Amino acid sequence: MKHLTKLLAAALLALGLNQAVWADDASDFRQTRQLAEQGNAEAQFSLGLMYDNGQGVRQDYAEAVKWYRQAAEQGDAKAQYNLGSMYYKGQGVRQDDAEAFRWYRQAAEQGHAGAQYNLGTMYENGQGVRQDYAEALKWYRKAAEQGDDDAQNNLGVMYAHGQGVRQDYAEALKWYRQAAEQGDAQAQYNLGAMYHNGHGVRRNFHLSKEWFGKACDGGVQEGCNQYRYLNQKGY
């Protein structure tokens, strides 16, 4: 689950708890629980986060699931996404790809980019649903168009390999570049490979080396290997 602390702070502010109040975790918890028990979906989501993150209360995944579910059943996309993640990871509930898929889909249909990306990966890998590259492409595109760098990279991969769509190196390059410019190390490596092989763009070893170097800095070992190779060749 991404950015729990940021999500928690934002959720508490949305409930009207000011900086001085939500600095006190125990006070946050009491106030949030009171609102959650009154049926406030945002508070239910926030309470789920608090249990999930162990903020103001002892960490308890089962309680997190309980409160995420209450908010999710009221249509809260963030709670649907987090509930899907609990099922996906088997935290506080038995691991269940089909249930993860069901909740991700509900959040994705409301425009939640993270859920759209996860739905894409589940369609691509056949997790909780029959493998379907065309559906994977569809959901990756939705997330990519919202700026999700992981989705942009995966969309590029699908265009590069012709999965769910006709192979198109120019489109692959476009999406790799968008992700790479956001700092996505795997996309930086993939963009370097496109320049190295001349796929969708004129071959350029200097630019290839530059992107491999960025990927290396981001922790992609093969980027380091390719950077050293090109450096030895004098590029």
Model-derived segments and spans:
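Short helix-capping/linker turns of helical repeat alpha-solenoids
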Residues: 32, 37-40, 53-55, 60, ...
